[in-house]
Amino acid sequence: MTVKDFIDKLLGRQTSSASTAKQRLQLVLAHDRSDLNPELLAQMRREILEVVARYVEIDIEEGDVSLETEDRMTALVANLPIRRSIQQSPNGGTL
């Protein structure tokens, strides 16, 4: 998600159909270039959420893990709203 997309979403602006089509095409290209099948991407998402949830309380429903392509480079992007930090004890357990 670009900064412009974030601001548009924050302000409740609708995206144009051309913009939506472009985002979908970029997603298809990112999946194709990364050679990750949807099942593997879903497994990665679950595991990433599990690891992050050990340290902070996250909003899983609002979170997003996706592939994004920009300038011929594909990145795995995790956008995870954090509710609060989880206190860790000195021995590694939660308090």
From Swiss-Prot:
SUPFAM superfamilies xrefs: Cell division protein MinE topological specificity domain
The keyword Cell division is annotated on this UniProt entry: yes
Keywords attached to this entry: Cell cycle, Cell division
Residues spanning the signal sequence: none
Listed InterPro entries: MinE, MinE_sf
Any Pfam family the entry gives: MinE
Biological process, per Gene Ontology: cell division; regulation of division septum assembly
Entry annotated with the keyword Cell division: yes
Domain of life: Bacteria
Alphabetized Gene3D superfamilies for the sequence: Cell division topological specificity factor MinE
Summary of the function given for this chain in its UniProt record: Prevents the cell division inhibition by proteins MinC and MinD at internal division sites while permitting inhibition at polar sites. This ensures cell division at the proper site by restricting the formation of a division septum at the midpoint of the long axis of the cell.
NCBIfam families to which the protein is assigned, alphabetical: minE, PRK00296.1
Family from the record: Belongs to the MinE family.
Protein name in UniProt: Cell division topological specificity factor
The organism's taxonomic lineage, starting at the top: Bacteria, Bacillati, Cyanobacteriota, Cyanophyceae, Synechococcales
